Amino acid sequence: MDWNRVEGNWKQVKGKIKEQWGRLTDDDLDQIDGNLDQLEGKIQERYGIQKDLVRRDLDDWYNRQTWN
């Protein structure tokens, strides 16, 4: 996963992230501002799932995206 691609396009990508993880608020996403560790932590907090499962889910999500 090339997270730099996500960080560099955060304003466009955060809508897709919110579609996948709807419990994340706009304020959460603004605070995360593309930081992978913060995103993982916030998903763990909102969904109550383990970090390794969050990373797997993020990898799966990333691989399903169409990157231009």
PLM region descriptions:
Residues 1-68:
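Intrinsically disordered, low-complexity, hydrophilic segments
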